[in-house]
């Protein structure tokens, strides 16, 4: 088996044209890369495909979120394995090879995850430590770097595109475990997740409002989908009441950002409760990186 033939890398980009080349340059030029550009920036497609012979940029018809963006890439691949990476992930020299080598020898897994520098996992995320030395069975791994076994993933199903943001990984992990596929943490494969934002303060405010809306919507949707309506209300009703109180308080003291954030949280929960789709979107325009 050949790593270059058996593996495809996927990035999902959203207004990342200032930083996308850095993660691409970490990848061996023989490994095919798919970039899904959720900002619908066709100029970026032309630029990257002209510069990198191993890069294909896909422009979806609309922004369906991170999980939906990954799905766009997954539907294009023909390889045995896929490595999804956030654009702000730094790889060690051996990270990809270590994940691939483990994938070739491990059985019955759906997803492998690397260890993350300065990010120890809580004990509650481990199902079985050291099933072989340095390999742990998990119920959750951070979604910034996911190594997919495509045969298993085709059995489980791809990401739930009703979820725009938050809980998309939890959903696919739970579906994976229900089908008895393992999620494995590979200690020897290490990454650094920078978690940096490339947007300015105003844009970060807009993104923060967007994130809060979707966190609340997805919390209700995920728990309703997998555990029923009562559990969904248990998880969100006090968050709704708390957000209402804070919305009133920050309206009185005229903290406009906090007021918008807590209104967004209430709106996200309310829309999920009444069965509306995850419709809220950031208002960032195409020229924010100019």
Show which residues each predicted segment covers:
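A short, conserved alpha-helix in the catalytic core of glycosyltransferases
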Residues: 145-148, 152-157, 162-190
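Short aromatic/hydrophobic "clamp" motif used to bind/position activated sugar donors
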Residues: 82
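Non-catalytic, C-terminal membrane-associated alpha-helical segments of glycosyltransferases
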Residues: 210-218, 229-290
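Conserved donor NDP-sugar-binding/catalytic core segment of glycosyltransferases
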Residues: 93-124
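A recurrent flexible, glycine/aromatic-enriched loop bordering the glycosyltransferase active site
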Residues: 131-148
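Short, well-formed alpha-helical segments that are part of the catalytic scaffolds
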Residues: 11-29
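Glycine-rich, basic loop-to-helix element that forms the pyrophosphate-binding segment
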Residues: 60-77
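A conserved acidic beta->alpha catalytic loop
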Residues: 26, 37-46
């Amino acid at each position: 088996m050949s790593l270059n033939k058996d593996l495809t890398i996927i990035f999902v980009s959203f207004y990342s044209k200032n930083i996308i080349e850095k993660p691409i340059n970490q990848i061996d030029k023989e490994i095919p890369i798919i970039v899904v550009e959720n900002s619908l920036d066709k100029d970026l497609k032309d630029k990257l495909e002209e510069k990198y012979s191993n890069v294909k940029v896909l422009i979806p018809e609309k922004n369906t979120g991170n999980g939906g963006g990954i799905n766009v890439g997954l539907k294009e691949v023909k390889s045995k394995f896929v490595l999804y990476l956030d654009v702000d992930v730094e790889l060690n020299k051996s990270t990809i090879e270590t994940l691939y080598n483990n994938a070739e020898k491990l059985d019955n897994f759906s997803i492998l995850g690397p260890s993350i520098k300065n990010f120890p996992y809580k004990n509650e995320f481990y199902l079985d430590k050291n099933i072989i030395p340095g390999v742990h069975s998990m119920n959750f791994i951070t979604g910034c770097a996911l190594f997919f076994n495509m045969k298993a993933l085709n059995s489980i199903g791809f990401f739930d595109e009703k979820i725009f943001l938050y809980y998309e990984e939890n959903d696919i992990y739970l579906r994976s475990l229900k089908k008895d596929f393992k999620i494995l943490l590979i200690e020897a494969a290490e990454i650094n997740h920078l978690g940096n934002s490339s947007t300015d303060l105003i844009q970060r405010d807009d993104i923060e409002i967007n994130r809060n809306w979707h966190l609340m919507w997805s919390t209700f949707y995920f728990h309703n989908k997998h555990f029923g309506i009562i559990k969904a209300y248990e998880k969100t009703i006090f968050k709704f009441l708390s957000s209402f109180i804070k919305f009133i308080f920050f309206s009185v003291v005229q903290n406009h950002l906090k007021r918008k954030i807590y209104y967004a949280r209430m709106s996200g929960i309310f829309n999920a409760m009444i069965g509306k789709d995850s419709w809220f979107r950031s208002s960032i325009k195409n020229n924010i990186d100019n």
